[in-house]
Amino acid sequence: IYNKHMKVIATAVTNFDIHDIARTARTYDVKKYFLIHPLKVQEEIIKKITGYWQHGFGRVYNPDRSEALDRVQYLPDIASAVAEIKKLTGKEPVTITTDARIYPNTITYKAARQMLYEGDRPVLVLFGTGFGMEKETMAAFDYILEPVYGPSNYNHLCVRSAVAIILDRLAGEAWWEK
């Protein structure tokens, strides 16, 4: 992940990101929410938070939240997520990521939605934090979704907002067909 100076860093996982993205994933019936982070200290934080809701008192205290957090699985890297999907489905996933820029392999939400509903392979959609993923990482994806545009020229959504908007476009109700 880049910071605002285009230096490679590792951003911190937040409790809000874990909870809010898990709830959004559950709402849109995402099978797994892979929380990918290379640092051991972040793995420990992720496992402590998810463990509380998956196995601890949180499971009893708030079963709805627990149901959402059950979809979260920590993994150290993208290759592990691809391998896990292949293990679960027997198929190599189509890899799609997001960015605020256009790339040669940028696709529309309509095309990505068709892959989800009509394709014969599972789809792994990755979201980054900070100021985007490294160039080498971006080049490894099959596709990059077109940016989310609002009515202004400001285009730097927090990851929780981007996930909610994009999952609604990919897996939400097709309201425009009504």
How would you name each of these model-derived features?
Residues 96-137, 147:
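Long, charge-patterned amphipathic alpha-helical coiled-coil/hairpin "stalk" segments used as oligomerization
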Residues 31, 93, 122-123, 142:
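Conserved acidic residues
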